[in-house]
Amino acid sequence: MRLDVVTIFPEYLEPLRAALLGKAIDKGLISVEVHDLRDWTHDVHKAVDDSPYGGGPGMVMKPTVWGPALDDVLAAGDGDTDTLLVVPTPAGVPFTQATAERWAGEKRIVFACGRYEGIDQRVFDDAARRVRVEEVSIGDYVLIGGEAAVLVMTEAFVRLIPGVLGNQQSHQEDSFSDGLLEGPSYTRPATWRGLDVPPVLLSGDHAKVAAWRREQSLQRTAERRPDLLP
């Protein structure tokens, strides 16, 4: 898989090359290219934004910069039809575990990181003539820009690519993998600061352990995310 990120803060995306994601790059499972949007500006101030039509607060990122940037970045791929353009925005559809699972099968994803009041909508309308475009939100809150959302989403779907995790069963038992939250986890020692590991986990009875985990998962989901239950 190839990942491209267009941003005015390339340094923000350095964590993409660290830890598990860095190992995926080393294994050749993914490649990452980060592009500085200001490379496509033509004025001495390298301006990427302008006042919004219709008035209002803030600034809007210019199509005359974003358009050429995406033209060049998309052209660098093996074929536009295999590319997914993702726009992180609080006005987008919710990013979920199902989204992550779907994206893990993509050949190429390009992220367009907005700032200020966002990017001129015509940029995405134009791009949609050539590639698939998804505007996606990671939650009902507003960030300063799209970069943090890119880091969150990338970690969520890259870990699902076969070969990235040492144990593929790890993500199969995650929260949301079966529509429920994952229950509590424990490791050695069996007693710590007067707190004991639930005896069933020490029993060696796999059926009882599985039943206990299911019960804990249902209980936690009911308490914290009842909206996930039927």
From Swiss-Prot:
Location within or outside the cell: Cytoplasm
Keywords tagged on the record: Cytoplasm, Methyltransferase, S-adenosyl-L-methionine, Transferase, tRNA processing
Binding site for S-adenosyl-L-methionine: 114, 138-143
Catalytic reactions of this protein: guanosine(37) in tRNA + S-adenosyl-L-methionine = N(1)-methylguanosine(37) in tRNA + S-adenosyl-L-homocysteine + H(+)
UniProt enzyme class: transferase
GO annotation, cellular component aspect: cytosol
GO molecular function: tRNA (guanine(37)-N1)-methyltransferase activity
Similarity comment: Belongs to the RNA methyltransferase TrmD family.
Subunit text: Homodimer.
Task performed by this protein: Specifically methylates guanosine-37 in various tRNAs.
The protein, known as: tRNA (guanine-N(1)-)-methyltransferase
Species the sequence originates in: Rhodococcus jostii (strain RHA1)
Taxonomic classification: Bacteria, Bacillati, Actinomycetota, Actinomycetes, Mycobacteriales
